[in-house]
């Protein structure tokens, strides 16, 4: 049931006017015949206490006080209600609750009950309370009329506001779509925020000062990174330009080289050459080349055959062959005599296959400081490179014993004795000259 219908169409109040109330054992007022004494309206109860009141009377008093407070400043209250939608909603709910409570109270049917006899004071108190209820009902009816008028004014104002809102909605129809999108975004943000709030919180971790990154440091780092990127772009552009320049220079060089080659070919004059003479000269050079290759090949084959023949000879035949046909030594030099502590120079082994006078010189002749007689020097100075970092320790090893008796080779043991007798060279009693081929032992 709506609030207007509840206020206008009130049900008839069922009452027992003119009946004599009486109290039962529970202290309630009942109407009708009973065993107890009856009390007529207008008689005061002897046990009435003016300062006492029931819960229902307290509620009525609070409601009347609230209504009077509302009547004090109706204009200000109506202005606040019109401006604030929350107050309007609160007032409407309050009016609805009051109407429902009043209807429930008026619909209460009081049935007659059989009560026991009570004292005259109780009957008089009940009569006074009934009279108080009648007067409060009249005041409530007056307050209800005022509330209805106030409620109708509020409804008219609300209808006017609804019309204004409908006009604004029609004017802002296009903007509503964007508003819905923003609202969806805000709802999504609220949803994400709520999700973030539901996430587990992490334990705070201490970060050292040198490892912290503040906003200024982050901005400085971003600026530095941007400068580095710009510098890298600049260097890449310079490299590209330098590469293009090098390619252009190389292309120019190749073009100039081709031009020079063509110019040299054009400048070559071959009109005066005789092709027959050139061909005859080439034939002579080719024949000499062929002859030289054949002679080298024959000499190599002859040398291999001689080596094979010498290998097949016995020891006596080989000695006789060497005595009869001595070995021919090319560029044989005269063997000279070296002086005391004279430096030795080797003439080398290359290019000795053909006789040359320069290779036949005496290379044992003294040079530079070797002309001096070093035998007259003191014993301590008779060493090579005396006074230098490369000086030798001994003059020569003829008079020096360099045997190391502490080494493993100098120890007398069964293993060393067996090695010296069977494998060591120069320590056995019998000496056999090794041959070119290994002899087969049967």
Curated annotation (Swiss-Prot):
PANTHER family: MICROFIBRIL-ASSOCIATED PROTEIN (PTHR15327). GO terms for biological process: mRNA splicing, via spliceosome. This is Microfibrillar-associated protein 1. It comes from the Eukaryota. Component of the spliceosome B complex. Interacts with PRPF38A (via N-terminal interaction domain). Residues 134-148, 181-198 have a biased composition (Acidic residues). The keyword Nucleus applies. Residues 1-34, 113-203 are annotated as: Disordered. One of its GO terms (cellular component) is U2-type precatalytic spliceosome. InterPro entries: MFAP1, MFAP1_C. It is found in: Nucleus. It comes from Gallus gallus. Widely expressed. Pfam families: MFAP1. Involved in pre-mRNA splicing as a component of the spliceosome. Its main location: nucleus. Belongs to the MFAP1 family. Keywords: mRNA processing, mRNA splicing, Nucleus, Spliceosome.
